[in-house]
Amino acid sequence: TPYIPGWDTHGLPIENAIQKLGVNRKEMPTAKFREKCDAYAHEQVNKQMEQLIRMGTFADYKHPYLTLQHEFEARQIEVFAKMAMDGLIFKGLKPVYWSPSSESALAEAEVEYHDIKSPTIFVKFQVKDGKGVLDNDVNFVIWTTTPWTIPANLAICLNASYNYALVETEKGKLIVLDTLVDELMAKFEITDYKVVNHYKGSELEYITCQHPLYDRESLVILGDHVTADSGTGCVHTAPGFGADDFFVGQKYNLPAYCNVDEHGCMMEDCGEWLAGQYVDDANKTVTMKLDEIGALLKLEFITHS
């Protein structure tokens, strides 16, 4: 049986290659742009096929399969239909990587990581309903490297088995992981402080906090993904961004609230002071707003992938 060679000819790499040739996909009908992608894909397949033949490889090069062939696409639809008929397909939500420049979802294999310098902030969320456990003048301290996601915060996630300390300071009563108290107080430049109580994370579940920027609540929830190696032990949770946030949010019936459009810009429900800004620019705007209202405890910059 001869080897049947095949080429995967779909995806962003083809579209990006066409755009590098000077083609603007927004200035032509989608069908026309697809025609150019089709022609480019065939051209590359022919080049690679010629190279493979010259290298002396043996295969049935007269009958290759290409994922852009209509018969191949039809077969995919047949398989999908069979899966649907067997009850294997359901409609749901899932967080995916997104490219603002391409306005398209990305596969994990298409994501490249580079070291970048990002702002990291520590923010106070004041208790609104302490459920008889905490007073309303207590603040949970969250940490994030993506300040632009703070407007989408719906929850604060703790680890059920961790011990959390209530610390009295000149900057308010703060809830942080007990093993990080001294380290965090030094970071916040707080020299006069006292630990007045301890709580298991499980004791603080369902307490609500006031979102520092908007008239809505942030729910205290529990999740196994919360670790003790960095941050504060109180994880800023925006279910519309990131897998951990999304899946733990589902357990508490929190919506996957996304306030960023396909271009990577903040949407109108973020408020006039933020709407229209690209997420990288929103980092600074959100941080300044938090500082202005007294919710920002610390701003640092870190290098990470």
Regions inferred by a protein language model and the residue ranges of each:
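N-terminal, positively charged nucleic-acid-binding surface of large information/translation enzymes
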Residues: 1-171, 238-270, 282-286, 290-305
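Short glycine-enriched, charge-decorated loop/helix-capping segments at active-site entrances
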Residues: 271-276
